[in-house]
């Protein structure tokens, strides 16, 4: 018997609500949670590979190449989920486009669901207008359910 997998997108500003929601669903389904942190300021050094793993280079050629990616917040959140919800949590750190990276991990792991947070903040609207939102990309390019967790504190 295989364990179902739920993929959740995370980044430095990911609301605890998104990770907690994904963890509660994983616990109810007795599923494993794969937390995917994607550095969209970097791209894979080998675009042919396209996995997002391994060597990466900055998207902006003027940036320093030796800047370490700080994933401590995601690792800390994953450790908290392991103890609070008592589920298996795997963390993957990738580079490139978040939507494509999440889709790739979901396909590679045969995930039953992808969980992402809604965009918020003043820059979110501009980013979505220029590049499209990760949630929208996933909803239009996935065969598995995509759950978009609202993260805005504002109520209508």
Predicted regions and their residues:
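A short acidic, glycine-rich active-site loop
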Residues: 55-72, 123-124
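Active-site phosphate/pyrophosphate- and oxyanion-stabilizing loops and adjacent acidic/basic residues
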Residues: 23, 79, 136
